[in-house]
Amino acid sequence: MAIRIYNTLTRQKEEFKPLHEGEVRMYVCGPTVYDYPHLGHARTYIAFDVIRRYLEHKGYTVLMVMNFTDIDDKIIKRANETGEDPKELAEKFLRIFLEDMKALKVKPADIYPRVTEHMQDIISFIKKLQEKGYAYEGSDGVYFEVRKFKDYGKLSKIKLEDLVKGARVEPGEGKRNPEDFALWKKAKPGEPKWESPWGEGRPGWHIECSTMSSKYLGESFDIHGGGNDLIFPHHENEIAQSEACFGHEWVHYWMHTGFLMVNGEKMSKSLGNFVTVRELLKRYNPEVIRLFVLQRHYRSPLDYSEEGIEHAKNNLERLYNTLENIRVAMSKAEISFRWDEPEFRAYEAIRDARKKFYEAMDDDFNTAEALKAVFEVSNAINRYLTEVEKPKESILRKAWEFFKDVGEVFGLFEDYFKEQKAENDEELINLLVEVRAQLRKEKKFDLADKIREELRKLGIQLEDTPQGTVWKRIKV
């Protein structure tokens, strides 16, 4: 089944056909770095991380670019409030963002272009728009003349006449028309500034992404993504600038994530109803946060609550318990010389769930439906292990490989599937279990208890049974 993507531009699902066979070029709007990332930001970047992972899992080579807006009105305002240098403030929060994304197991982009390192590229882009008659210089900067671009509004479906009536227009003294937006802002006293043909100043927000995405991905590329709040004006203005400059369709698939909601309102810094990634990571494993996000389709609103996070935590524990059950069962599993009814049932459940998983992910990356298939395998394999005395290695291996594929796509279970490390760990743990058993035989209970306690601190729990000591991994 081909991958189908919901294209915001057409408001329908379309079969995904990249411009270059086997390769996907993808741009995701990155943060304006003036504060700590919150869960609303994380929702977007986890969603696009999983989309990228799935495309790679399906065999595509993905070139992913995500920008940093490291000069902006918000950065200047925050720097004035704190007394920091705007450059240092942006650098601090840029590093914090990268640290938080790494903690959340979001794979790094291939390129992270920063606005301040692309000023000449931005100036060249604006000059091209001027030469083509789409941009003009006003008293306070350079503006894009919206009404000259005939397709304006095709992404957001906003009509120009409605915009002129005052719907979300940007202020500016030098505008010819109220709907026009800034490409270059002339410097104000005390603000960071760069030399340009129009005097000292800095770029407008929208031109930055048009410039940096096309520099690294070309004048046409496959996927442009971001949050729903970027559809208008940001992405609408990006289309106008880029297609005016290049003279043809710019981006083929526009993808947008739904809002993270708190008590019926969008989580945002302006409303003060946000929880930072760092706050959550103090209380929850990063995989809990990922699973919380993946329990809803990326386009749907996601309601944040402590109960919702706890539900994700419990679900993650269920999956880890299943993995542990498989691992323990592997030690007594036998080669499959014969299958009986329990094996056929387990095999069919795994086979059908794998099919459902890929069908869901091919259908606009529907992680919520895909997760249902994951829990079907979890339930089926646990049921199988209660039905048989000696499980078959082939059944356990198929379940194990399914969870490994899920982990690769969803960014879960990473510690379980670093195989070489896991094998070495298991050999060492088994050796310590044997040493502890010998110590107990010799009545050296203090040392035996010491081994048990130290292993527990490392996430290994020992259980003494009539058949001997078994161990399992736990979250610490």
From Swiss-Prot:
Cofactor (UniProt) = Zn(2+)
Keywords, in A-Z order: Aminoacyl-tRNA synthetase, ATP-binding, Cytoplasm, Ligase, Metal-binding, Nucleotide-binding, Protein biosynthesis, Zinc
- Reactions mediated catalytically: tRNA(Cys) + L-cysteine + ATP = L-cysteinyl-tRNA(Cys) + AMP + diphosphate
**Which CDD domains does the annotation name?**
CysRS_core
Instruction: Spell out the molecular function terms from Gene Ontology.
Output: ATP binding; cysteine-tRNA ligase activity; zinc ion binding
Q: Does this entry carry the keyword Aminoacyl-tRNA synthetase?
A: yes
Write the Enzyme Commission number(s) for this entry: 6.1.1.16
What stretch of residues is annotated with the motif 'HIGH' region?
A: 31-41
* GO CC field: cytoplasm
Q: Where in the cell is it found?
A: Cytoplasm
**Co-factor binding details:** Binds 1 zinc ion per subunit.
Q: Does the keyword Aminoacyl-tRNA synthetase apply?
A: yes
User: Might you name a Gene Ontology BP term for this protein?
Assistant: cysteinyl-tRNA aminoacylation
The residues that the entry says bind ATP are K269
Q: Which domain of life is it from?
A: Archaea
Q: Which cysteines are joined by disulfide bonds?
A: none
Major location category of this protein: cytoplasm
**Binding annotation for Zn(2+):** C29, C209, H234, E238
> Motif range for 'KMSKS' region?
266-270
Query: Which NCBIfam families does its entry note?
Result: cysS
The record's similarity note reads: Belongs to the class-I aminoacyl-tRNA synthetase family.
- Name under which the protein is recorded: Cysteine--tRNA ligase
